[in-house]
UniProtKB/Swiss-Prot annotation:
EC numbers on record: 2.7.10.2
Origin species: Gallus gallus
Main location, first listed in the record: membrane
Lineage start: Eukaryota, Metazoa, Chordata, Craniata, Vertebrata
One GO CC term on file: cytosol
Residues bound to ATP: 355-363, 380
Location relative to the cell: Cell membrane; Cytoplasm, Cytosol
Gene3D superfamilies attached to this UniProt entry: Phosphorylase Kinase, domain 1 (3.30.200.20), SH2 domain (3.30.505.10), Syk Kinase, Chain A, domain 2 (1.10.930.10), Transferase(Phosphotransferase) domain 1 (1.10.510.10)
Gene: SYK
Stated family: Belongs to the protein kinase superfamily. Tyr protein kinase family. SYK/ZAP-70 subfamily.
Record domain SH2: where: 14-106, 167-258
Active-site residues from the entry: 472
Stretches the record annotates as Interdomain A: 107-166
Record's protein name: Tyrosine-protein kinase SYK
């Protein structure tokens, strides 16, 4: 489940996955075709949708189950249901538009898993290649991007995948499309798809007995694609997959993609396997003459230089990778990190007004001039009229921790500057602290909040893996770059542990944020990644209560007594039970029984993928 978004039907014994209509009919015939015998399969027309195949009167009836914008499932014109299983249960008691009640499920044979579609098989590689090319990311940054943005990337890939296919030729004229198809082999079933206009319509050009046939592909008001009077599809690749199995209104099946100019020698980028499961007799294209039996995989891609994928300027929601702070400015080989990360004051300009203030001094917005231009920065300026060396040491300690950290979900230090005051120059996160943002923006969805806290868990997992304890993890110290991009900040209390240490012991009780602290911190002054996990539980509570203060109206001592009694904060009103269960797990009293961030991040990731599906 960690690598693939969970299919909400995979656990159902009567779900067969990405099988064709004909395969479904064959299975139900094997099952005896009794009235009310049914199975569930993946829709080959609609993203995230399903199809119900139901036997009645010795015939098989097929019903499309669409996934609605709200995330619910419904048969056209029917009631909405939270899941495919709930829909099936409902129709086993109410026909409500079906030809009969669902009486008996036809289950997969033992050991047979639901069949994944060919696009599913290639999706991981498509995503990896897309991220590499769109944002020029590699290594750790690439992996972090794929994990945190998987749902958005899957949607993006699903709707733009046709642009990377050899059969898609972009905006060319009718005459040019005929010219291209007639170059080289003239086998029946050779085809290409071209863009017709800016309204989202296309044309399918198909070779039949030496003649090029043109079929218009229109997009309706809901965004669905179809040839006139044909089946409707969410994407072009689903349409091509369908017509490569059967003609269904075309003169013949699509069998040989016409390659784009200059692509014949470098046609394959990821995989040359035939479509998974193609040999099945159930998948032989109906009405396809013998000369068209060449195995054709509509998912084999063009080489990288042929990619026309969505660029950053396209009309889509900005992802963290689109921002200037996803990678360190020093990741650019032209930007040389100054020695001891000491910055030249002349290259730093400060703006009027404050972003925030605290015991240490103030934070201002500024710009730091680098080789590739001025970068917006946040500058922590030390207030030290009394010239107290302890305050300076504290700032330098924070700088020392920060300069060792490099992760997309942690505020990076650009450098330090000694001038009219000591200054810590950091990445800018324009939207400010998470708690304040959520207090002012109650419209932010549960999915959006889950996305943000998952990013925080990724940043904390990185700290845990690198033996750093944050010691001040709270919603006020999570800064937002955008509504969909969070970074952990404020490392003033953070400690680096040596390789053989797993906790830090403070010498005395300081000005500590006790409402965020685990029992072992208060009782024994012991701090570890596991105590950060406790704080993360409180941070999640703050996020899902839209920035409310934890333990409102209670003093630190009262909070400690409440925890010793085994009591915990109540579930916030808008918080899903799965998230609250994870909070309670983070608030496990015994530190040895409490999960680490590896487990917490994975659990949040899986939940986020589930609700994004």
């Amino acid at each position: 489940m960690a690598s693939n978004m969970a299919n909400p039907a995979n656990h159902l014994p009567y779900f067969f996955g990405n099988i064709t209509r004909e395969e479904a009919e064959e299975y139900l015939m094997q099952g005896g075709m009794s009235d009310g015998l049914y199975l569930l399969r993946q829709s080959r027309n609609y993203l995230g949708g399903f199809a119900l195949s139901l036997a009645y009167g010795r015939k098989v009836h097929h019903y499309t189950i669409e996934r609605e914008l709200s995330g619910t499932y419904a048969i056209a014109g029917g009631k909405s249901h939270a899941s495919p299983a709930e829909l099936i249960n409902y129709h086993s008691e109410e026909a409500d538009g079906l030809i009969c009640l669902l009486r008996k499920s036809f289950n997969r044979p033992p050991g047979v898993e639901p069949k994944t579609g060919p696009f599913e098989d290639l999706k991981e590689n498509l995503i990896r290649e897309y991220v590499k090319q769109t944002w020029n990311l590699q290594g750790h940054a690439l992996e972090q991007a794929i994990i945190s943005q998987k749902p958005q990337l899957e949607k993006l890939i699903a709707t733009t995948a046709h642009e990377k296919m050899p059969w898609f030729h972009g905006r060319i004229s009718r005459e040019e499309s005929e010219h291209r198809i007639l170059i080289g082999s003239r086998n029946n079933g050779k085809f290409l798809i071209r863009e017709r206009d800016s309204n989202g319509s296309y044309a399918l050009c198909l070779l039949n007995d030496g003649k090029v046939l043109h079929y218009r592909i229109d997009r309706d008001k809901t965004g669905k694609l179809s040839i006139p009077d044909g089946k409707r599809f969410d994407t072009l690749w689903q349409l091509v997959e369908h017509y490569s199995y059967k003609p269904d209104g075309l003169l013949r099946v699509l069998s040989i993609p016409c390659p784009r100019h200059g692509s014949e020698s470098d046609n394959v980028v990821f995989d040359t396997r035939p479509l998974p499961g193609t040999p099945s007799k159930l998948q032989t294209p109906i009405g396809a003459p013998s000369d068209d039996q060449t195995p054709f995989n509509p998912y084999v891609l063009q080489r990288a230089r042929g990619l026309i994928g969505a660029e950053k300027g396209d009309q889509r929601e900005a992802l963290p990778m689109d921002t200037e702070v996803y990678e360190s400015p020093y990741a650019d080989p032209d930007e040389i990190k100054p020695k001891n990360v000491t910055l030249d004051r002349k290259l730093l300009t400060l703006e009027e007004g404050e972003l925030g203030s605290g015991n240490f001094g103030t934070v201002k917005k500024g710009f730091y001039k680098m080789k590739k231009g001025a970068k917006p920065v946040a500058v922590k300026i030390l207030k030290n009229e009394s010239n107290d060396p302890a305050i300076k040491d504290e700032l330098l300690r924070e700088a020392n921790v920060m300069q060792q950290l490099d992760n997309p979900y942690i505020v990076r230090m650009i450098g330090i500057c000694e001038a009219e005051a000591w200054m810590l120059v950091m990445e800018m996160a324009e939207l400010g602290p998470l708690n304040k943002f959520l207090q002012k923006n109650r419209h932010v969805t549960e999915k959006n909040i889950t996305e943000l806290v998952h990013q925080v868990s990724m940043g904390m997992k990185y700290l845990e893996e690198n033996n750093f304890v944050h010691r001040d993890l709270a919603a006020r110290n999570v800064l937002l770059v955008t509504q969909h991009y969070a970074k952990i900040s404020d490392f003033g209390l953070s400690k680096a542990l040596s390789a053989d240490e797993n906790y830090y012991k403070a010498q005395s009780h300081g000005k500590w944020p006790v409402k965020w602290y685990a029992p072992e911190c208060m009782n024994f002054y012991k701090f570890s990644s596991k105590s950060d996990v406790w704080s993360f539980g409180v941070l999640m509570w703050e996020a899902f209560s839209y920035g409310q203060k934890p333990y409102k109206g209670m003093k630190g001592g009262e909070v400690a007594q409440m925890i010793e009694r085994g009591e915990r904060m109540e579930c916030p009103e808008a918080c899903p039970v799965e998230v609250y269960d994870l909070m309670k797990l983070c608030w496990t009293y015994n530190v040895d029984d409490r999960p680490g961030f590896v487990a917490v991040e994975l659990r949040l990731r899986n939940y986020y993928y589930d609700i994004s599906h």
